[in-house]
Amino acid sequence: MERGAADIGVVGKDILLEQSSDVYELLDLGMGKCRMAVAGVKGERPDGGHTLRVATKFPNIAREFYRKQSREIDIIELHGSIEIAPILKMSDVIVDIVETGTTLRENNLEVIETVVPISARLIANKVSYKFNNARIRELCDRIAENLEKKD
């Protein structure tokens, strides 16, 4: 998108945050709703006295979240079933997308706090938006009207 391969597109907010994408975020489509959350072993809360070990597929989101809290962290970047990291004592917590929480419960984990709500977003390439503003705005407005009709 950023390199001009497309004028507009749909992407999850998690991807926009993780990649620090240089695009215009035009509209929250309200689809694919979930949340990025910190989760840990049920009933356990990591103490603040040590560097927090965080397993995640989203290292940039996790770093930014804990930077705002002035918390020292050690990122353990994993792909796949990161829910096993706290169980195996590889990490204190995970930062991951949570929709229903079923996978967390199945692994004896629970949400500690929400990092950010996630949903699908309509985005535009900045150059395309500049040169095709009227067409893109018209499309964006029509999509927004249809979304309002659904509510």
At which residue positions do the language-model features occur?
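Domain-level signature for soluble enzymes in the chorismate/prephenate branch of the shikimate pathway
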Residues: 2-151
